[in-house]
């Protein structure tokens, strides 16, 4: 069946449910896991009223710290379950980063949440989940 699962997480509560589901599935299948969190590239200007310049170094440092925290949590959960887990932080548009990581790591299933940090603003699926489902050649398990 599946031998190598990619579990995508942004650290949100719903993504945490996808992590738990993916790890339990990996354990049941005897599969290994690659956990990925994707950070969008820095944007110099934050649009909107009262726009301000956000220093790239500060953004990159905060993104790296957040990714390390999120991925360390996944690795700790995997270790408790006895599941082999590699962690990866990618700077890319989220859907593209997930798809590319699955391909690069040879994953045969992507596990991800239906919605991420941007909230449940869409009725069925968030925009990143839709993009992954639309463009991935690897099967995708969406968790709600």
What are these regions, as identified by a protein language model?
Residues 76-110:
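Structural beta-alpha unit
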Residues 24, 100-144:
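Gly/Ser-rich helix-loop-strand patches that form or flank binding pockets
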Residues 3-54, 77, 81-86:
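Small/aliphatic-rich secondary-structure junction motif
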Residues 18, 45-48, 98-100, 122-124:
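Short, well-ordered secondary-structure micro-motifs
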Residues 54-69:
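A short acidic, glycine-rich active-site loop
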Residues 1, 37, 82, 93, ...:
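Conserved functional loop/turn residues at catalytic and ligand-binding sites
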């Amino acid at each position: 069946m599946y031998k190598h699962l990619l579990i995508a997480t942004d650290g949100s509560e719903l993504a945490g449910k996808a992590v738990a589901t993916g790890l339990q599935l990996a354990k049941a299948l005897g599969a290994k896991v690659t956990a990925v969190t994707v950070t969008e590239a820095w944007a110099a200007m934050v649009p909107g009223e009262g726009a301000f310049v956000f220093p790239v170094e500060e953004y990159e440092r905060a993104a790296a710290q957040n990714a390390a925290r999120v991925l360390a949590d996944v690795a700790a959960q995997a270790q408790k379950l006895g599941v082999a887990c590699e962690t990866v932080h990618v700077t890319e548009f989220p859907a593209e980063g997930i798809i590319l990581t699955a391909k690069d790591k040879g994953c045969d299933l992507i596990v991800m949440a239906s919605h991420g940090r941007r909230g449940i603003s869409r009725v069925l699926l968030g925009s990143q989940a839709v993009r992954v489902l639309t463009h991935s050649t690897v099967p995708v398990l969406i968790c709600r």
